[in-house]
Design a protein with these regions (language model features):
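Formylglycine-dependent sulfatase
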Residues: 1-164
Length: 164
């Protein structure tokens, strides 16, 4: 859609548009990003991938991630780096041509994996166990003066006109 208007189009991240039977290294490639109007692609073809050891594709070619878990690699940082690289390359090569960079990060999808230091930062919050943490969260979410288990009239009133 933008290519006929003179745009260069770059896509980074989750594609998940091509059927699994057509997303392997042998193609066919017409449903891949380059076959759908993008000039460059770096990311993964399926709905999800390991955030530390992803199955990546550069343009139409499978490629290894540029780092490893042991070295601090995480897919989100890699995708941002590749986005910046596409934009920098475009600016150096074709600064007068408009461009689109579509970034679809994968960390919001399964598998949900966080860096170990972030996981460990929550240890104190859950030191008393999951149930105690859940109860504390529920208590903090209620209006002052509302009894546990008492319905929230304001929410019910707002939802009443909603028809499923």
């Amino acid at each position: 859609m933008l290519r006929p208007q003179g745009f260069r189009n770059y896509m980074v991240g989750k594609w998940h548009v091509t059927p699994l039977t057509q997303s392997g290294p042998a193609g066919p490639y017409d449903g891949w990003p380059l076959g759908r109007g993008f000039d460059r692609f770096y990311g993964f073809m399926d709905a999800e991938t390991d955030q530390y050891a992803p199955e990546l594709v550069r343009d139409n070619t499978p490629c290894d991630p540029p780092g490893r878990f042991a070295d601090g690699y995480h897919l989100t940082s890699d995708l941002i780096d590749q986005s910046i690289r596409f934009i920098a390359d475009h600016s150096a090569d074709r600064p007068d041509i408009p461009w689109l960079t579509w970034v679809a990060l994968g960390a919001c999808h399964a598998p949900h994996q966080a860096p170990q230091d972030i996981i460990m930062s929550y240890d104190a919050a859950f030191a008393h166990g999951w149930e105690a943490s859940q109860e504390a969260g529920q208590e903090g979410s209620q209006d002052p003066g509302q009894e546990p288990g008492e319905p929230d009239g304001d929410v019910e009133a707002r939802l009443r006109p909603v028809t499923p």
